[in-house]
Curated annotation (Swiss-Prot):
Taxon lineage: Eukaryota, Fungi, Dikarya, Ascomycota, Taphrinomycotina
Subunit details: Ago1, chp1 and tas3 interact to form the core of the RNA-induced transcriptional silencing (RITS) complex. The RITS complex interacts with the RDRC complex via interaction between ago1 and hrr1. Clr4 has a role in mediating this interaction.
Basic and acidic residues: bias regions: 328-361, 403-416
Main location: nucleus
Record's keyword terms, sorted: Cell cycle, Chromosome partition, Cytoplasm, Cytoskeleton, Nucleus, RNA-mediated gene silencing
Function field: Has a role in the RNA interference (RNAi) pathway which is important for heterochromatin formation and accurate chromosome segregation. A member of the RNA-induced transcriptional silencing (RITS) complex which is involved in the biosynthesis of dsRNA from primer siRNAs provided by the RNA-directed RNA polymerase (RDRC) complex.
Originating gene: tas3
Protein name, as recorded: RNA-induced transcriptional silencing complex protein tas3
């Protein structure tokens, strides 16, 4: 195989179907899709032809594949320039890539160079498609690109499709002017410079306007020529307007300047500077706590001993809300105001919702006599409450019993349960671990790794990162395969066999596809034998089918 062909094969657009490149996911990337379809057509035509006895066709196919790669790269550069939302108003070739809900219309281009005479491509002529033989020689297409999609809104613009000159009968292609990319780059650079200079002017302004005046290094002119930019977000002030209508902060040197008496934080008349409503006022806080307790009829709730020793059920909300209110009061002094207390009392004493029902039950418990507390079974609580001390003793005994039970359960726990403690949170963790170990064991069982010490060393270093989910299995394959040094080598591997390998790879399962795409890099980069690569791909496919069963 020729050296010129071999260096292009590893990165052909055909491989983009195997590897999930982000730029091939979106439907808006029409040029990449067209190029990939073109490469598929070329390979299909190649398989249909008998190229073993026709070496000249093989050379033509390789040249066409190289062209498809350069064409796709050029189209991506064009899309990157056209998708830039800010273009010059008077640019020689102005285009927008707009997308509608109806979908993206595909545009099929004619063959450019050295394609087979059996393939026909439709040629767009005045809205009609005519089959044209693609045996024509392609001109120099360094500056010829696929043009962005035109929608119904841009009918007044000149169509960028290929057309036939009726007067001369020759095919002319409207090419993308070289000055377009230069003008777009120049406009973007000027825009970034103007923005940076404008920011510096704002920081160091003494008496200038905060808005974007006419002396702002041309940002106003450039903003008028933008297509997609909404300039309403910028506050523009007319420099020629009457000074009395300008804002007051315009004359300030800076809002946070230390010499500005109006912006000094130490001269506040009210707010944080007041000492009457200091946060350290404990009388107001104590009064507020008592008032809140009285609002829900908890007379004895404020005693610290009972509050600390009170064994709260899991679903209680009384003590939780009280702690929340105390924490809130410590950070928000305004919450002690009468209006805030009235709102909270209204919230705590309202008649709807599960919170009000719980408060009613709590007030019932604390306000009834000892004989009446035995009727708690009607509310769902099947235990007897004595006085406060008995209740605290019962709570502590329950705590002790719970701790003893936890300690006994930990002592009687099996070691296997400790190792698999995290599996209870994720039921699929054990299954995923077993599956991953199956893949790793499959890699270790390959003769390729057993006879290659460098691959084994790389695998040992990579496995910890793989178990920590820092890399996926395809990355493990790429790292391990790239570390190989000794493997079956075959020089001048024929192109048809490589194409058949890629065609078979595209039909495989995800695991086998990842293995095949990783091993194919060794085929093109280090002349790995295609037979050996096909054998590894076959073993990966067998393992995947067994795993599915």
């Amino acid at each position: 195989m020729e050296k010129g062909i071999k260096k292009y094969l590893p990165s052909l657009p055909f491989l983009a179907c195997i590897s999930d490149f982000p730029e091939n996911h979106g439907t808006s990337r029409r040029s990449a899709t067209v190029s990939l379809e073109r490469v598929h057509e070329l390979f299909t035509e190649h398989w249909l032809s008998n190229l073993k006895n026709r070496r000249e066709k093989r050379q033509e196919l390789a040249e066409e594949a190289v062209y498809c790669r350069s064409e796709m790269l050029s189209q991506r550069k064009l899309l990157a320039a056209v998708d830039f939302p800010q273009q010059l108003k008077n640019s020689p070739a102005k285009a927008k890539a707009t997308h509608t809900s109806s979908g993206v219309t595909k545009e099929v281009r004619a063959s450019k160079k050295y394609t087979s005479s059996n393939v026909e491509f439709p040629l767009v002529t005045d809205g009609k498609e005519k089959p044209v033989k693609s045996k024509q020689l392609r001109k120099n297409s360094v500056t010829e690109f696929e043009k962005p999609i035109e929608t119904k809104k841009s009918k007044h613009r000149k169509s960028r499709n290929k057309f036939l000159d009726k007067s001369s009968g020759s095919m002319e292609i409207e090419s993308w002017d070289n000055s377009t990319s230069d003008s777009i780059i120049e406009s973007s650079s000027r825009l970034h410079e103007s923005i940076s200079l404008r920011e510096n002017d704002i920081r160091s302004s003494d008496s200038k306007s905060v808005g974007w005046d006419d002396n702002s290094t041309g940002f106003r002119e450039s903003s008028k020529s933008l297509d997609h930019t909404d300039t309403s977000m910028f506050m523009e002030l007319d420099s020629n307007s009457d000074p009395q209508f300008r804002p007051k902060y315009q004359a300030k040197s800076s809002w946070f300047a230390p010499d500005d008496p109006e912006a000094s934080w130490g001269n506040l008349d009210d707010g944080w500077g007041e000492t009457n409503g200091s946060w350290s006022s404990t009388d107001d806080t104590k009064h507020y706590k008592n008032e809140w307790a009285e609002s829900i009829n908890l007379d004895n709730f404020n005693r610290p001993s009972q509050q600390e020793d009170y064994d709260k059920p899991k679903n209680t909300q009384v003590s939780r809300s009280s702690n929340h209110h105390r924490r809130y009061d410590s950070y928000h002094p305004d919450s002690r105001s009468d209006s805030y207390r009235s709102k909270r009392e209204h919230y705590d004493n309202r008649d709807t919702g599960p919170r009000s029902k719980h408060l009613e039950k709590s007030s019932y418990v604390y306000n009834q006599n000892f004989e009446d507390r035995t009727h708690l079974s009607d509310h769902g609580a099947h235990f007897h409450l004595g006085n406060a001390n008995d209740f605290n003793m019962q709570g502590s005994s329950r705590k002790r019993k719970a701790s003893d039970r936890q300690r006994e359960s930990r002592e009687n726990e099996l070691p296997t349960k400790k190792l698999n403690a995290s599996d209870s949170h994720n039921p699929l963790a054990s299954l995923t671990t077993d599956k991953n170990d199956l893949y790793i064991n499959w890699l270790k069982s390959l003769s390729f790794f057993q006879t290659n010490s460098s691959c084994a060393e790389a695998l040992v270093k990579v496995i910890p990162h793989y178990h920590n989910k820092l890399i996926d299995f395809s990355q493990v394959l790429q790292l391990v395969f790239s570390a190989s040094e000794k493997f079956p080598i075959q020089e001048n591997q024929p192109l048809p066999e490589q194409l058949m390998f890629l065609s078979n790879l595209e039909k495989q399962t995800p695991f086998a596809k990842a293995v095949g795409s990783s091993i194919y890099k060794l085929v093109t980069g280090k002349n790995l034998s295609l037979d050996f690569a096909s054998q590894i791909l076959k073993e990966a496919s067998i393992l995947e089918h067994k795993n599915e069963k």
